[in-house]
UniProtKB/Swiss-Prot annotation:
Disulfide cysteine pairs (residue numbers): none
Domain AIG1-type G residue range list: 1-205
Gene source species: Mus musculus
Free-text tissue specificity from the UniProt record: Expressed in thymus, spleen (in splenocytes), lymph node and lung. Detected in mature B-cells and thymocytes (at protein level).
Transmembrane segments: 251-266
Ranges where the record places region G3: 58-61
Pfam families attached to this UniProt entry: AIG1
Major subcellular site: endoplasmic reticulum
Disruption phenotype: Severe lymphophenia, leading to death soon after birth.
Cytoplasmic face residues: 1-250
Protein name: GTPase IMAP family member 1
Subcellular location: Endoplasmic reticulum membrane; Golgi apparatus membrane
Entry binding sites for GTP: 10-18, 31, 129-131, 166
Membrane topology qualifier: Single-pass type IV membrane protein
Name of the gene encoding the protein in the UniProt record: Gimap1
C-alpha cells in the first residue's frame, strides 16, 4: 500500500496540531489555544485516503531559537526523524494567515538546518485561519502581500500554498483535506514517487533496533554531536572574522595616520615655500 509521510513544521502557536487533525479528519493531536504550547513530544497518526496510507508527524517546539532549551538532548529532533523514516514525502510548513513574523523566519532557518535546503523542493506552505480571507483568493493574498520574507518563502517552495480553516467540520473539513493531500500527491508524482532523504535518515536506517526508544537515543546522540560540531565551526568562523576585522581596523588606522602625517609634512612644506616667495 503506497504511503504519504508528512511532517508538520513551523514555529509553535501557528496551529500545527489543529492542521494535523484537519488532515486526519479526527482529533488525533492535542490542540488548544494558549500562550503555552501543548505539544511536548513528536507524535505519529495516520488515516486512509484515496488508496494511500497517510502518516502525519506532529512536532513540538524544535524549530525555534530556543532549541537548546526546549530540546537540549535533541531527543525530540531524533524522534521526528525516526517516526518519519525512511523519509517524508512532504513537509507542511504551517504559518498563520497575516502573521508571518521573524519567529517564522527563524523556524524556516531551523527546518533547513535539520533537513537540508533541498527539502524546500518538498515543502508546502499551509496557512491557518483561512476564514480570515473572507472569500478572497489565497493566490491574490500571497501575490499582493508586502511581506518580502513570505513572498520569498512561497517562491522557494515553488508556489505550493494551501489554506485551512481548522474550525471546519464534516464535508468542509474533508474538502480541505482533499485539496491539500491532492497537492501533496502531485508533488510525490513529480519526484517519481520517491521520498525525501538525507544523511540523518540514512543513519536512522543504519541504527534500526527492536526497541524504538533505544533507536531514538542513538539517533539523538548523533544529531547532538552534529549540532555541537556545527556550533563549534560557526564559533571558530566568527572568532576568525572578529580577529580579521580587528586587524584590518588596526592596519587601516596605521595607514591613515601615516597618510595624514605625509600630507601635513608636504602641505606645510608647500605652504612655507609659498611664504618664502
Amino acid at each position: 500500500m503506497p504511503q504519504l509521510r508528512l511532517i508538520l513544521v513551523g514555529r509553535t502557536g501557528t496551529g500545527k496540531s489543529a492542521t494535523g487533525n484537519s488532515i486526519l479528519g479526527q482529533k488525533c493531536f492535542l490542540s488548544r489555544l494558549g500562550a503555552v504550547p501543548v505539544t511536548r513530544s513528536c507524535t505519529l497518526a495516520s488515516r486512509m485516503w484515496a488508496g494511500w496510507q497517510v502518516e502525519v508527524v506532529d512536532t513540538p517546539d524544535i524549530f525555534s531559537s530556543e532549541i537548546p532549551r526546549t530540546d537540549p538532548g535533541c531527543v525530540e529532533t531524533a524522534r521526528c526523524f525516526v517516526l518519519s523514516a525512511p523519509g517524508p514525502h512532504a513537509l507542511l510548513l504551517v504559518t498563520q494567515l497575516g502573521r508571518f513574523t521573524m519567529q517564522d523566519s527563524q523556524a524556516l532557518a531551523a527546518v533547513k538546518r535539520l533537513f537540508g535546503k533541498q527539502v524546500m523542493a518538498r515543502t508546502v506552505v499551509v496557512f491557518t485561519r483561512q476564514e480570515d480571507l473572507a472569500g478572497d483568493s489565497l493566490q491574490d493574498y500571497v501575490h499582493c502581500t508586502d511581506n518580502r520574507a513570505l513572498r520569498d518563502l512561497v517562491a522557494e517552495c515553488g508556489g505550493r500554498v494551501c489554506a485551512l480553516n481548522n474550525r471546519a467540520t464534516g464535508s468542509e473539513r474533508e474538502a480541505q483535506a482533499e485539496q491539500l493531500l491532492g497537492m501533496v500527491a502531485c508533488l510525490v508524482r513529480e519526484h517519481g514517487g520517491a521520498h525525501y532523504s538525507n544523511e540523518v535518515y540514512e543513519l536512522v536506517q543504519d541504527t534500526r533496533c527492536a526497541d524504538p526508544q533505544d533507536q531514538v537515543a542513538k539517533v539523538a546522540e548523533i544529531v547532538a554531536e552534529r549540532m555541537q560540531r556545527r556550533t563549534r565551526l560557526l564559533a571558530g568562523l566568527w572568532g576568525w572574522r572578529k580577529f580579521y576585522w580587528k586587524g584590518w581596523r588596526r592596519g587601516f588606522s596605521v595607514f591613515l595616520g601615516v597618510a595624514i602625517l605625509i600630507y601635513l609634512l608636504f602641505y606645510r612644506k608647500g605652504f612655507g615655500d609659498q611664504n618664502n616667495r
